[in-house]
Each structure stands twice: as C-alpha cells, then as structure tokens.
C-alpha cells in the first residue's frame, strides 16, 4: 500500500477532546499515522492564550496514549528560528521538500477552518502541495458556504473514496464524516475564566497541566 503522510494543524489552545476525536477518526479512515502540528502565532487568528511551549507540551500529553497520533513541533521550531509569522503554506512547502514530489500528503482541518481558507496566505497553492481532508463540523454545509473564489478552486477536486488520496501526491479533497464533537478551545478558555465546569472537554493530563501551570487565568478562580 502506498504511504500516506497526514498532518493536522491547529493552535490547540488548548487541545481538547474534539481535536482528538477528529484525529482518531482520520487515523481510522485513512489507515495512516496523524502528526498534529501546533501553529505558531497565526496571522489570521487572535494570539493564542498560552505560550507555544505550553501548547506543545499539552499536545504531547494528549497524544501520549493515543496509538497512531503524535505531536510535530516543526512549525514552532521554524517560527523560533526565523522570528516571523507562521503560515501553513510554509509548513507544507517544507514537508513537500522533505518527502519528495511523489509522496501523498494530506492536510487535515475542520470545516470551520476550511470555509475561511481564503484568508490564509497563498491558499490557492495548497492543492499543489497536498490533499485536503475536511472534518465535518456542526452547522456547516460546505456545498453552500464556500465563497465563489474558493468554489472555483476546489469544487472539482472532491473525491468520494479516500483510497484515491494514496494514488496521487496532492490535489484532491475528501470529507471526513465523523460524529462532530461540540468542544471548542474558546469555550474551554471561557469556562476556565468563569469558574465553570471545563475538565470534561480535556484529557486528565491536559487538565492537570493547566492547573499546575496556572494557564488561562485559572489561579484567579482558585
């Protein structure tokens, strides 16, 4: 079976059970390991609420007992070396250079991120570097919510069978139909600051890390 390299990018601020559910579903559907890549401060989103090293450590803790999942620090390391903004297209260009032109590469992202892809740097280049696997999210219908300029680039690229992704190195889109989890990082952060229940949305190891390191203002509510 041809090899398949799958990368799941995000701020993971913090990583929660919804992220892990998507990664597990992709691992099962694609029969390939999933490398989760925490982004440096993303230019198109607010600055993360915890440091890059905290986000990486929480991600490492979250995947430590998850077969087939790993944390990949390459984007944080590159941002630290170059001291500049973080862009997915740069990460994928680096990955493509490492793996060569014939290797099948997948970038995994949620539907909520995908519908805003036109805000990303050089987003039109992504199909030349990778396949895109989009995890469905509640309330988002991709067929009707894509801006016209995105529809022009992507609508002819959808495939029904994920096996197709192994046959070519890049250029296709596939919808990962998984049971959407309502967890979100913003809700977790808000719950912590409001002294509401938040632990159920995280693994025990990540919850303990937040307590130990006083992240997201938790010391203010103890």
From Swiss-Prot:
Pfam annotation, one family: CTP_transf_like
InterPro entries reported in the protein's UniProt record: Cyt_trans-like, NadD/NMNAT, Rossmann-like_a/b/a_fold
GO molecular function: ATP binding; nicotinate-nucleotide adenylyltransferase activity
Signal peptide: none
Pathway noted in the entry: Cofactor biosynthesis; NAD(+) biosynthesis; deamido-NAD(+) from nicotinate D-ribonucleotide: step 1/1
Catalysed reactions, as listed in the record: nicotinate beta-D-ribonucleotide + ATP + H(+) = deamido-NAD(+) + diphosphate
Protein task: Catalyzes the reversible adenylation of nicotinate mononucleotide (NaMN) to nicotinic acid adenine dinucleotide (NaAD).
Name assigned to this protein: Probable nicotinate-nucleotide adenylyltransferase
Organism per entry: Xylella fastidiosa (strain Temecula1 / ATCC 700964)
């Amino acid at each position: 079976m041809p090899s398949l390299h799958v990368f799941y990018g995000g701020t993971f601020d913090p990583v929660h059970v919804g992220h892990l559910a998507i990664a597990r579903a992709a691992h099962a559907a694609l029969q390939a390991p999933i490398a989760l890549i925490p982004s440096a401060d993303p230019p198109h989103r607010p600055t993360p609420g915890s440091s890059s090293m905290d986000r990486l450590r929480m991600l490492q803790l979250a995947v430590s007992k998850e077969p087939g999942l790993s944390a990949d620090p390459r984007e944080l390391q590159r941002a630290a070396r170059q001291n500049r903004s973080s862009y997915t297209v740069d990460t994928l260009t680096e990955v493509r250079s490492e793996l060569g032109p014939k290797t099948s590469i997948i970038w995994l992202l949620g539907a909520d991120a995908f519908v805003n892809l036109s805000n990303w740097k050089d987003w039109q280049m992504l199909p030349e570097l990778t396949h895109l696997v989009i995890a469905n999210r509640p309330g988002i219908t991709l067929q009707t919510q894509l801006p016209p300029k995105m529809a022009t680039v992507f609508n002819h690229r959808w495939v029904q069978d994920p096996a197709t992704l192994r046959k070519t190195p890049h250029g296709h889109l596939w919808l990962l139909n998984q049971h959407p989890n309502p967890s979100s990082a913003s809700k977790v952060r808000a719950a912590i600051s409001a002294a509401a229940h938040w632990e159920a949305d995280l693994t025990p190891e990540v919850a303990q890390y937040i307590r130990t390191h006083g992240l997201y203002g938790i010391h203010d509510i103890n």
